[in-house]
Amino acid sequence: MAEDTQGTDTPSTAPINVPDKPALEGLEAALTRRWLAEGTYKFNPDTTREQVYSIDTPPPTASGSLHVGHMFSFTQTDVLARYQRMIGKNVFYPMGWDDNGLPTERRVQNYYGVRCDPATPYDAGYRAPAEPAKNQRDFDVVSRRNFIELCEELAVEDEKVFESLFQQLGLSVDWQLTYRTIDDASREVSQRAFLANLAAGDAYMAEAPTLWDITFRTAVAQAELEDREVAGAYYRYPFFTEDGEKIYVETTRPELLAACAALVANPDDERYQPLFGKKVTSPVFGVEVEVRAHALAKADKGSGIAMVCTFGDLTDVTWWRELQLPTRAIVGRDGRIIGETPDWITTDAGRTAYEAIAGKTVFSAKEAVVELLAAEDLIDGEPKKIMHPVNFYEKGDKPLEVVTSRQWYYRNGGRDEERRARLIARGHEIDFHPAFMRSRFENWISGLNGDWLVSRQRFFGVPIPVWYPLDADGNPQYGAPIVPLDEQLPVDPAADAAPGYDEAQRGVPGGFAGDADILDTWATSSLTPQIVGGWSRDEDLFAKVFPFDLRPQGHDIIRTWLFSSVVQADALQHAAPWKHAAISGWILDPDRKKMSKSKGNVVVPTDVLDEFGSDAVRYWATSAKLGADTAYEIAQMKIGRRLAIKLLNASKFVLNLGATENSVVSTDLSVLTNPLDRAVLAQLAEVVRQSTKAFENYDYARALQITESFFWQFTDDYVELIKDRAYGAAGDAEQASVLAALATSLDTLLRLFAPFLPFATEEVWGWWRNGSVHVAQWPLAVDVDGDTTLLATVGTALSGVRKAKSEAKVKQRTEVLSATITASESLTTQLKAGLGDLKAASNARELTLVAGEGELTVSDVVLAAPAEQPKA
């Protein structure tokens, strides 16, 4: 039912060599070594685009350890890769490591006990402490260059561990196609993309309110936000009109009272319409602000009128921008209230009050402002305690602030309807699996409220490749950035002089200053197709792999990785980056919560692989459909292990039948004479058709279910039914027929199972075939003149006889003197075709077939006296 890789009708056979005691133990290490040595999964660049199947593999974050979720999603990708390889595709299957950005930076800080200060001189002989300090205040202070060296050193060690684990899992990656998102090639591609976007007007710098993480001291993009429910309270206090009337506001952030730039109410709210355009005075600080109208104000929220502070949240930013309000920022980038009293606070009482909060964290400042309000008896009632969603950076542990800063942005449709529509159209060039995941992509685009902020105020990452000329006073001319020559890439403006300047001119009037920021890690990770495909470096390779055939990833990063990759490919290649997107679900713990390192509920992959074996873990992973959140189930892994062991043992039985020294097993179908043999192969042909269709639809779980269901029927029923004939009891012709059916079935089943159980199938393949099953051809459905339901019917009758023996508490080999099988006329006809095998398997002298109505039943079973009673 299959052809081998040489394209011949007869697979390449070898003398049978079956071990006495087949076992799964030790297969992973031995076969991995062989695959690596033989280049089993090596991509052949001497090919055409039509022959290639290219995969944009997700690079896992190199920040300590993998978890069971990686095994789950990467295995799902691997079975798709293995199927494509077996149908004749030249599979381009790389592996990357995402080792730039905050996760690596944070791990290095804690692992070595260091923190970076760009002002610290480089120490060429620096060695990190043997034992890191327990308190971060005692960490070694190192230069940016020293810090980056430590990041690279630790990332390389982590990646070795990751590679070893993925090989143990059986990923059919070409391990010569690896990259790191911080290596020279990745930095070159990332910087070249930035410069291309800059030249096209798709990258720009702006000074504007920015979401800011006070722990990491960096700007954060919309895609990196995470809403978390936190405890808070509404405080109600008044502003005062000119005639002393109290206008009450209700806010969860009284600490921003000194930053208030206006009060705002809905234009249709009759309570406040008389106040629009008039001034009111803030309590405690005594600052006049105007009452304004805006449609975003909600009449039914709180008192219906709100403070506009610069800036409490993104709604404040919208009001500030659209109402053209003054900027009155009081929160610094360190999350503390700015020390210098702002000039808009002019009264002595107000300036004294500000001194009471200056330098405090926002949390301490809140307490101080509440005390100041209470001291003047201005708090109306008790604070109303609530739980409410607050913006956090997804990797941070403190609420985000909004501060004004100068940042770089990529245009992503957040402010451009035409671009937004174009990006949605790009999404329709991609087949999403499952299809409903497309709506998450489109909903994200539709909900964007700004362009993509790509600059970060951190140390370890891809430097933004620009410098700025300094005027006569030493001020940077941000509007006239200096860009590197193409052949200079990659560059580090903090270490490399700008073109046309020398290092002595750095930081002096009339000289230059390098941009100190790095690119957001997603700005580089979004370019994985371009990085691994050789864009701008190997155009021949790029033409063969781009657009990639497959992007596999989790559904939680559709808004980040998938979307940003579409943005980059649209801008750079004017195309979608892939043809298909396979979206994995989450792994859930026993409480049905997502497993994640941050939650502390992850399972260590090595423990699971060592206990159950890789094939068992792969079985669990591929039993789940794409997009489905799946429970971590030990029971499912046990089933997978049982399946792999059964495959070894059943294969041993088949191959040992009639085997002699140096013999080979024949799959010559011309010798088929028995109806049951033809039936099992006809049924198997249908399994091949259905499994192939499922794989073509990216439904590997369906392919596994179909194959596994047939396999158990094959081993439990067919193998039991034909044993007598297989041993020659019915003559040479019948034996030849059954041996050909067995060998053909085994050959086909090994190929069908190969993507799922790569170790067990490869082990068995080596017992009687040359080469690797993983580069053998996917089985072809060969039409055999047989009844596809015959095996099920005869198997049901056999089960009925077995049940009677079990109920009589005798061994299954006990002779049946007589029994009656009642079935419909059509089933009776089928039973006649398999009656010889049924009698032999049942050890029955006489089986009487009776045509009747209803389901098949076995009755009137008369058993011979057992030679030996079964043990209790």
Where are these regions (language model features)?
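Short Cys/His-rich metal-coordination motifs, predominantly Zn2+-binding knuckles/fingers
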Residues: 216, 285, 396-397, 470-472, ...
